[in-house]
């Protein structure tokens, strides 16, 4: 199979047409009257919304903007600006009260205080994986980092129980958003449009029954860098194009690369393609100017994440 640095270049005009046809077919097949989409202020939701408008028209696409008190303020700002560019109707709902009622922040903070007893409302927190996978080998252990707002940062490696507690609480943000999306979708008899791309799907970078709980996934076949190609072609606003991708679920801001992927998307996607299609190691090294050890290190990371997240990509098992 062929492999070169431009292997992921796509014909954007044809791809948009193909995705539009898919969206139209699904709306008809499922007898819905339009599309409902969560707008995060990121590139995936911006591209998805824009293509939905091309497929169905602006009057058949409704956007929900669902910030909470720890969201980056620019997320809502950019989502609103993109929606205005598309001329679609939106509604903004602060989900903080729902999260507080469930105990999202309290449950997470209780776990954090087991590591850092001083942690209170004046602090911010995030979790990250070891940086720069290409430069050094490291296990996928998560580190908790807290900032006191005075320039002081502390960090500690997380054990399994502590990590699970933080992730379980944080993932409730995604699941709360999906609850709101489906409420409005059922009211309007609309489909919920997902925004997860192929890079995220393969590596398990989504939340089961959260952002992964949708009716259609029009970007699931595209790597993240291909989504950016479509974004440029469609004319997504510059603020979103230039923004570093982020899960935007932690009070202490963190990028996708810091939190999970450990290498830039441009490198990640090419290596992921090579791993997925079993491109010979020597060819990958020559094309990307990497050593065999670097490529092996990254593919070990791919395999570990893929295997650990298989359940996210599967339907619930049944007897028959």
Language-model-detected regions and their locations in the chain:
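Catalytic nucleophile loop
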Residues: 45
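Conserved G/P- and acidic residue-centered "switch" motifs that form tight phosphate/ATP-binding loops
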Residues: 42
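ATP/NTP-dependent adenylation/nucleotidyl-transfer catalytic domains that generate, transfer
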Residues: 1-37, 51-54, 59-62, 70, ...
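Acidic, Mg2+-coordinating phosphoryl-transfer loop and its flanking beta/alpha structural elements
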Residues: 67
């Amino acid at each position: 199979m062929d492999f070169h640095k431009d292997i992921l270049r796509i014909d954007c005009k044809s791809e948009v047409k193909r995705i539009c046809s898919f969206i139209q077919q699904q709306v008809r097949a499922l007898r819905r009257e339009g599309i409902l989409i969560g707008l995060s202020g990121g590139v995936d939701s911006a591209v998805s919304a824009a293509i939905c408008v091309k497929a169905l028209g602006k009057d058949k696409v409704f956007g929900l903007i669902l910030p909470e008190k720890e969201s980056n303020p620019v997320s809502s700002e950019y989502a609103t600006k993109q929606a205005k560019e598309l001329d679609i109707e939106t509604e903004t709902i602060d989900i903080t009260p729902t999260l507080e009622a469930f105990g999202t922040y309290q449950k997470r903070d209780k776990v954090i205080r087991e590591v850092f007893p001083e942690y209170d409302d004046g602090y911010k927190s995030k979790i990250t994986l070891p940086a720069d996978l290409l430069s050094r080998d490291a296990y996928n252990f998560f580190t908790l980092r807290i900032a006191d707002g005075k320039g002081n940062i502390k960090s500690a490696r997380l054990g399994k129980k502590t990590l699970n507690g933080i992730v379980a609480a944080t993932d409730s943000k995604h699941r709360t958003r999906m609850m709101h999306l489906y409420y409005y979708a059922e009211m309007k008899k609309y489909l919920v449009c997902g925004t997860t791309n192929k890079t995220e799907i393969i590596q398990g970078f989504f939340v089961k029954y959260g952002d992964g709980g949708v009716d259609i996934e029009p970007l699931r076949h595209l790597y993240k860098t291909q989504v950016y190609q479509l974004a440029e072609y469609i004319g997504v606003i510059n603020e979103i194009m230039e923004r570093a991708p982020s899960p935007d679920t932690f009070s202490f801001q963190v990028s996708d690369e810091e939190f999970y992927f450990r290498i830039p998307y441009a490198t990640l996607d090419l290596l992921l393609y090579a791993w997925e299609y079993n491109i010979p190691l020597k060819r990958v090294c020559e094309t990307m100017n990497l050593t065999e050890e670097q490529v092996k290190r990254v593919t070990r990371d791919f395999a570990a994440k893929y295997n650990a997240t298989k359940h996210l990509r599967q339907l619930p098992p049944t007897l028959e």
